Amino acid sequence: MLGSIVKKVFGSKNDRYLKSLNHYLKEINALEENIATMPDEAISARMAELRAEVQQGTSLDSILPEVFAMVREAGKRVLGMRHYDVQMVGGIALHSGKIAEMRTGEGKTLVATLPAALNALTGKGVHLITVNDYLARRDAEWMGKIYNFLGLSVGVIVHGLNDEERRAAYASDITYGTNNEFGFDYLRDNMKFYKEQLVQRPHHFAIVDEVDSILIDEARTPLIISGPSDESTGLYRRVNDIIPRLKRDTHYTVDEKARAAALTDEGVQEAEKLLGLDNLYDPQNISFQHHILQALKAHSIFTRDVDYIVKDDQVVIVDEFTGRLMPGRRFSDGLHQALEAKEGVKVEAENQTLASITFQNYFRMYEKLSGMTGTADTEAVEFQQIYDLEVVNIPTNKPMIRKDQPDSIYRTRPEKFNAIVEEIARLHHKGQPVLVGTISIETSELIAGMLKKKGVPHNVLNAKQHEKEAEIVAEAGQAGKVTIATNMAGRGTDIVLGEGVPQLGGLYILGTERHESRRIDNQLRGRSGRQGDPGETRFFLSLEDDLLRLFGSDRIAGLMERLGMQEGEPIENKMVSRAIENAQKRVEGHNFEIRKTLLDYDNVMNQQREVIYSLRRDTMMEDDLEPSVHEFLDDIIEDIYAPLEQTKGKALDEETHAAIAARLEETFFLSRVYPEFALKGSEQQEKLPELPSAADVKKAVESMLEKLKRDAGPVYGDILRYFLLEELDRNWKEHLLNMDHLRDGIGLRGYGQRDPKQEYKREGFSLFQNMLWSIKESVFRALTRLRLQRVEEAADPAEQPEAAGLQEAKATELRHKEQPAELSYSGGDEDGAKTPSRRNAPKVGRNDPCPCGSGKKYKKCCGA
């Protein structure tokens, strides 16, 4: 009560913020008339002057009114579009690093040109992030006319570009692209071997379109680049064959809310019998446990045509938020293979993670981040807590006159679908266009089938038909059109009303089910009533819908029984609607906690990732790596000889002596580097009563490095860089796998009264320290086993040109080392499959002789 009185007197926080921007608005409008008289060349020349001033230290805020006024004028001249005052306010909010909540049809695409042009003057680059390649291309071309008029360069990052094209796009003042392309380019840059191969610049300023979709909906899906692992796929089929013989609730239980499945004690015994195992929980059977759980999820939780479809004998993921197909993306942890086995298609090899990052941590790297969406207010707390972003509600240019009708609730799904079809037929007969929103392909096809029987013409837009998306969306506002769309397919394209449609009541939005998130429901409503157009929305629900069945509790069903509902009769009751909204709030809270927990765990990995990528970048950029290599040498020798220091002059016991000797041999190949130390076996112990001194070992290894430097000539620096980066990448890849295993089992620590997050942090740090140490040692294991033939040493002078050519070829190979073979990409939602990049050089088998020339098998030498 008191809060509402205070709000009436002083206005809300949002109102006060908008009021504080009035002085900017007055200045911009005051400049409009004067700038309208300037020739085209004078405007671009003035922008060039302002760019120079900014790079000399002038603040962006001080020139904001003038730049915004020039962008407005550019819009009028090249597009015939003038930025409204409310769009100016949205632009100021974006420049200030906030989220601008703007209703559908209010011109978010045009708003972004204001802060983009202003911040481009810093010369550090502005990234405009969209949800798919189509929008990235469209906006870059469409809005690019404004930027080009102002003398600013524009690039676009879409799937299929080579590194040179990407580098040019990132070098532009303003770069459009999808969240996935930006994220994957960052990961790929951190797998490159030479600074000339990098494509991205440092992360300066990003404007994220549909920010709720990217930073909230996709926050749980990390971007992953992976390569093939050695694990066999036969086990997936073997386990899949036993799942139909297990009975739900007897042999296994399913938690639909948590989307998890688990074997019961009886189920464990049955699985052991069917698989011929003595003990499923024996450590050697750990892979069986993992495969059984994934197969149970594949059969009992994941549904065909809802979570995925089978297309061209492949399992293709359907994005739960947009309804789009995600070709080239795969579920992780063997779940995708379990689905392939379930559907009887080819089971692809499981992949091992080479690099990964969540969108949460990727976007937090930007110095300044802002975003636009039509629906952010319900997630304002999460934006504030996770990203430190404030949501500003921007008023509409024209009043909203759309009618949002109360939900119609039925007892059963068949009753609901019959009512939906009757309502669609009524509206079609009237001539009012209808957009039917469904949350699965299955539902969209069910309604389409019912409409076909009733003779109602319609278009279906779901993951299976998304190639026709633009054409179908363009027609959706025409009189008499019926369009069935899975979720928010077609988002980003406004539905324009046809002639005479406003008089019929505008676009009618019919929701067939409530989504777990109120925001997704609001997005569907937002397709109607754009720019002051009339419109109407209504949701049709049933007690058998997943949301009400899982989260609505029995109170709603009891309430509806007391109200005495008859078959086929709907109810429109505020108490029921409120109960449904509370169910959605509970699910939203649950999903927020999941995302927060994911971030807590990923923050541990993120800190480690930052250290590794920084070390990698320094190694790539450094011209002289010899000091780093010698520093590694000092650290290793000090560590190896530490037990000797601790004895304080006393004789070493035999076990410690043998351990030091073995480590010297393993790390430095000392029997080659320091021939006097030719430890062949335990009988050799008597011949070497004393270990070589630390100084002697250091001198011997440094001597080896000097010889390597002479033999390698000008490519010595490339050799050091190659091995430093190669060993860093190999150890990081193994560390990612170890961290995955740690994460999988860490939840069990809670049963021992220990905090799983703290345990993960502590053990993760220990693993990371071990990995850093392993990098140092593995670099020397590789370098001391490397054999190079000097050109001058060729036996036949006639062979010298060939030897020289070989050395030149090796240098070129080192300078242009490719990324790992057969990379796979997963995470996020993007149109178009990722084509795996392949290495042309033959892969070295684990039992082949090591190419370094040591004479050992690869798996016992550089592949160890």
UniProtKB/Swiss-Prot annotation:
GO terms for molecular function: ATP binding; metal ion binding; protein-exporting ATPase activity. Residues 809-864 are annotated as: Disordered. Residues 810-820 have a biased composition (Basic and acidic residues). InterPro entries: Helicase_ATP-bd (IPR014001), Helicase_C-like (IPR001650), P-loop_NTPase (IPR027417), SEC_C_motif (IPR004027), SecA (IPR000185), SecA_CS (IPR020937), SecA_DEAD (IPR011115), SecA_motor_DEAD (IPR014018). One of its GO terms (cellular component) is cytosol. It is an enzyme of class 7 (translocase). Pfam families: P-loop_SecA, SEC-C, SecA_DEAD, SecA_PP_bind, SecA_SW. Coiled coil: none annotated. May bind 1 zinc ion per subunit. Belongs to the SecA family. HAMAP family: SecA (MF_01382). NCBIfam families: PRK09200.1, PRK12904.1, secA. Monomer and homodimer. Part of the essential Sec protein translocation apparatus which comprises SecA, SecYEG and auxiliary proteins SecDF-YajC and YidC. This is Protein translocase subunit SecA. It comes from Oleidesulfovibrio alaskensis (strain ATCC BAA-1058 / DSM 17464 / G20).
